[in-house]
Amino acid sequence: IEWEEKLDRKGHYIFCPNHVSTLDIPFVLAILPVPLQFMGKSEIAKIPLFGYFYKNNAVIVDRGNKRDAYAAFLKAGKKLTSGLSMCLFPEGGIPKQDIFLKQFKNGPFRLAIEQNINIIPITMPDNKNMFPQEYFKGRPGIVRVKVHKAIELNNLAEKSIENLNTSVFNIIFNQLNTYGGK
């Protein structure tokens, strides 16, 4: 794990890792030293046993229901206001194996700007090959992770959502290329 800067354990953040594997959530929980919750799709809450823990540690969103998505957005804002950090995968899901990095959704960046919470991009280049969605096609090895320095928002205006999205995307994209991406 490479840290670009020391994390203030008393601070709270929105972490934005690239999403490449079904094991990304437990992996992020293992590496980050701060209490946090995830925002994730409602389908995962239906998985036996894992779903129980997921429901208690995530803001669940039904992405097909705009009203539910907005309610989840508000709930995530309340979690941040209470001092918890959030982890949001800006790709909105695990991309297909042949996709290098999916276009990011604006939700994490809108939330960060509305709450004036710093964003920390995280690059995970190896989980896709070591822990693919096809469970028996994985392999052992060393997993690299880079936790980038926080992007300080300093009361950015809402019109900056796209710029923030692009900045985080470029940080992760460039780091994936540095690691030898496709």
Pin down the residues of each PLM region.
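A generic secondary-structure micro-motif detector
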Residues: 2, 39-40, 66, 97-99
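Generic preference for hydrophobic
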Residues: 1, 15, 38, 145-147
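Non-catalytic C-terminal accessory region of glycerolipid acyltransferases
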Residues: 71-182
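Generic detector of short, locally flexible boundary/turn motifs and exposed helical patches
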Residues: 2-6, 24-28, 50-55, 84-87, ...
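Catalytic core of membrane glycerolipid acyltransferases/transacylases, capturing the structured
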Residues: 9-66
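A short beta-turn/loop motif at secondary-structure boundaries
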Residues: 4-9, 137-138
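Proline- and acidic/polar-enriched loop/turn elements at helix boundaries
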Residues: 4-6, 43, 66, 91, ...
